[in-house]
A protein has these predicted regions:
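Short Gly/Pro-enriched turn/cap motifs at secondary-structure boundaries
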Residues: 198-202, 226-229, 241-242, 268-275
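Flexible, small-/acidic-enriched active-site or ligand-binding loops
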Residues: 206, 256-287
């Protein structure tokens, strides 16, 4: 009895009698109290929420996500946890600083230790400290990195895919033991030197960088251009044509090799955080023990490119998804004519077209990675995904910029970066034209290469 009296007293202290008197002149208080008493807990909670908001319940909007078909729910709990771990890192560590570094064309080296803690480098490789996860997980990681910034995803792709991949697929056991553990921990940085100033798509038959055997060493001469990570790499995978048999071979070039020179490339409009370099090799001496022992022709080089081309398709998805999600978020906050622009028909049409492309791309690359995990991936599979995803990404980022109006070209709204970086994705790891010829050869039975 005493406790009930105490509760009644506490309730009485909080009653505003003047307000209650004014209210009783407008409504039948006993009737209201009876109606409120019949409400269940959920109904009462809803009523209180409405009262606290001044009688106007705030509209709860759907979450901002580009995963409209919930593809991530097909992942195992372990893989889903890793995906969210990478996403958190990118949103908390990269998003706040990315525009400044992009504008200054510098790389944020301070993030490398935290990136290493994610333990995702060399994600599909077995041994040497590598995680030995699926190709699907590798694709998911590439997408999550590119969803915030394509440059960081490209840096990672060069290190984990092209550089480490060349050693993992084509190196001797001694070479793997020497390089892969340190590269996996991001203590040793790698680069991949294939493209040349006058040779891009025609690398299979047109490399001008030469390698001349001289006893137990090789002499390398030539130039490489657009080489990501080149300005700070500890080891560079250099592809050169053997002057004796005319076959392409791979070499592990150490950064302190005499005759090696690298200059940072400036004035890029895309992937500005990536440190691309122009490499000059002048009588660089490389030991036979530093030649990739299983890289005997360009067919072996193509094995590396096939593996990484699938990752670039995922990267395109991430770029498109990031642009779409920023655009969607913007349109729900930006008001014109008294309401969010997301409420207008034409804006919704653009958003749906963007989402359609992002969803189609995601389902395509998901199947692509399944083929890779099943050992069924062919050149034409990866090439088709690269063609389709890079094209659709261009369309998505264009519409994302469009719905933002003039603000779409400001870095602070993020989409401008994606617009620029989509152009780089469109070109590297095989142009649309080269990849189209690869797919065309597969479906027609005729090669149109000249």
């Amino acid at each position: 009895m005493f406790s009930k009296i105490k509760e009644a007293y506490q309730l009485w202290k909080h009653i505003d009698l003047d307000a209650l008197g004014r209210l009783s002149q407008k409504i039948d208080l006993p009737q209201v109290m009876e109606a409120v008493g019949r409400l269940d807990d959920q109904q009462l909670a809803g009523l209180m929420k409405m009262l606290r908001s001044g009688g106007h319940a705030k509209k709860e909007l759907p979450p901002v996500t580009g995963d409209f078909y919930d593809i991530s729910h097909k992942l195992s709990e372990e893989d889903r946890a890793l995906q969210l771990k990478v996403r958190t890192f990118m949103e908390q560590e990269i998003q706040p600083i990315v525009n400044e570094y992009w504008l200054n064309a510098e790389f944020p080296f301070e993030i490398i230790p935290k990136l290493a803690e994610l333990n995702i480098c060399g994600v599909t490789y077995e041994g040497y400290g590598c995680p030995n996860r699926s190709f699907l997980m590798e694709g998911i990681i590439a997408m999550e990195l590119a969803r915030v910034d394509t440059s960081i995803s490209t840096f990672f792709g060069v290190q984990s895919g092209l550089a480490m991949g060349s050693i993992y697929l084509l190196g001797s056991e001694e070479q793997k033991q020497e390089w892969l553990p340190g590269m996996q921990q991001l203590k040793i940085m790698g680069a991949f030197g294939l493209t040349e100033p006058e040779v891009g798509s025609g690398a299979a038959g047109g490399l001008t960088t030469t390698a001349k055997r001289d006893g137990d060493k090789w002499i390398l001469n030539g130039q490489k251009k657009w080489i990501g990570n080149a300005t700070f790499a500890d080891v560079l995978v250099i592809w050169a044509r053997d002057v004796d048999d005319n076959e392409v071979k791979g070499f592990l070039l150490r950064k302190d090799t005499p005759g090696f020179e690298v200059k940072k490339m400036h004035d890029k409009m895309a992937l500005r955080i990536v440190q691309n370099g122009l490499i000059t090799l002048t009588d660089c001496v490389v030991a036979e023990s530093d030649r990739l022992q299983h890289a005997r022709s360009f067919k072996d080089t193509a094995e590396v490119l096939r593996m990484t081309r699938a990752g670039v398709a995922w990267q395109a998805v991430g770029c498109a998804r990031g642009a779409y999600e920023h655009a969607l978020d913007y349109t729900r906050k930006r008001k014109q004519f008294g309401k969010p622009i997301a409420a207008f028909q034409l804006v919704q049409n653009h958003l749906v077209e963007m989402l359609s492309n992002v969803t189609a791309m995601q389902t395509m690359v998901y199947r692509l990675s399944e083929l890779q995990d099943q050992g069924m991936l062919k050149d034409e599979h990866a090439s088709l995904a690269k063609v389709f995803c890079s094209l659709r990404t261009r369309d998505v980022v264009s519409k994302a910029r469009e719905v933002m109006g003039g603000n779409g070209i400001l870095l602070e709204h993020n989409v401008a970066r994606f617009v620029a970086d989509a152009e780089a994705i469109y070109s590297y790891e095989g142009t649309k034209e080269i990849n189209s010829l690869i797919v065309g050869r597969a479906i027609t039975g005729f090669s149109a290469f000249v």
